[in-house]
Amino acid sequence: MARGFIDCHCHISASEFTTDTDDVLLRAKKAGVKALVAVTEGASEFEKVIQLSKTYPGFVFPCFGIHPLQGSGQDLHSVRVQDLDPFLYLFQTYKDDIVAIGEIGLDFTPWYSSITQERDEQMKVFIKQLEISKELDLPVNVHSRSSAKVTIATMKELGIRQALLHNFAGKPSVAMEGVQAGFCFSFPPAVSKNEQRAKLIRQIPLEHVCLETDSPALGLDKHVRNEPSNVTISCEYIAKVKGISSDVVMEVTTQNALRLFSKLKI
């Protein structure tokens, strides 16, 4: 197996990368990144992420998913069923191309989903996409802000076996429920400034940890665009917290990623 990193959760189809995708991916390769798992937040990105996977074959691996929050800026709102239903056919159309269903999940942050109706709608969209993942035999790439316990419980209820909980911020006891279910957890560079997250990372076995950047967001400086090349920062931080070498973290997390995303061929 080639030595190197896998960025298990990034948004390379985001508008922030439109003008210099080549340069961004070249920097990633120079940093030792061997593959990007490219998630989407909405159906408007589906065709773009497929095109990127064809432009950069064997490096950009596409996922389809509808995020629990839709829109942007002042228009950011909790997802609705109509954000998913008209695009369900695309999951079937591109089932051979996509390597996972994501980014999907729940976001119960009070200012985005303050009422039961919004949370119920999110749950419907989440469950529909979990069912798609089972039908297509694909792993899920999952968001769980302010909803860690219910997110893990829902996946367990539906019999999900292959899941990545990205930028996980739940309690260690909740994380261990995910570990027992066989799920993996990934952490972006921004967590290196968070002592609570260090406690969490210490408790999760390395065999259940993956690397991610969540780029263009969640870099060390929130005012600077994050990039896949910064997956090295996540690796070094996890190594420091666990008291092991960066090489061991790189090797084990890459093995974990290849096991989780079985369609990745690097």
UniProtKB/Swiss-Prot annotation:
Binds 2 Zn(2+) per subunit. Exhibits AP endonuclease and 3'-exonuclease activities in the presence of Mg(2+) and Mn(2+). In contrast, in the presence of Ca(2+), shows AP endonuclease activity exclusively. Keywords: Hydrolase, Metal-binding, Nuclease, Nucleus, Zinc. Its EC number is 3.1.21.-. GO terms for molecular function: metal ion binding; nuclease activity. Its main location: nucleus. Zn(2+) 2 binds at E103, H143, H166. Exhibits 3'-exonuclease activities and apurinic/apyrimidinic (AP) endonuclease (in vitro). Show preferential AP endonuclease activity on double-stranded DNA substrates and 3'- exonuclease activity on single-stranded DNA. Belongs to the metallo-dependent hydrolases superfamily. TatD-type hydrolase family. This is Putative deoxyribonuclease tatdn3. It comes from Danio rerio. The gene is tatdn3.
